Amino acid sequence: MSRQIALLRGINVGGHNSFPKAAQLELAESLGLKDVSVLLQTGNIVFADPGTPPAETARVLHERIAADLGLTVPVVVRTAAELAAVVAANPFPQAAAEPKTLHVTFLSEVPADTSRLDALDPAAFAPDRYRLIGRELYLWCPGGIGRSKLAETVSRARLGVTATARNWNTVGKLLALAEA
């Protein structure tokens, strides 16, 4: 069975955008989504492919969350095959040994303007590194993302698209759920 994964940005982070796990499940099922699982409290919903393109699924979820909860929550959706490709394309395989140091920012589309990222001097942020591959921005911070100047700089780069990040542990768990 083909599956889709909805990634909601900014849910239950720092006490903002409260949207409990049970309510996420209920909302997804109320939209007619089937075989729904919610991973963690932070907006990771896995479900049977509803037969709509991922961008349409994202739009419907975004609009329903706004209508039902009054929250403006950006949503990015990937298919299970797309998520598997994200894992396979990891440009920092050495980071797999410490998955909390690797993050993937999922973008709604390929950014039209990457000049702010392109202008970054990698040496200025060593040992932290990033790589933009299609609609994913991989960020490896061996010393931890909380102390990373690169993470802060990249987050301010404003690529002009909807974006939400997950650490490698979460990416792996989402893929396992999507392939189950």
Language model segments and positions:
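Surface-exposed, charge/polar-rich loops and edge strands
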Residues: 2-42, 46-180
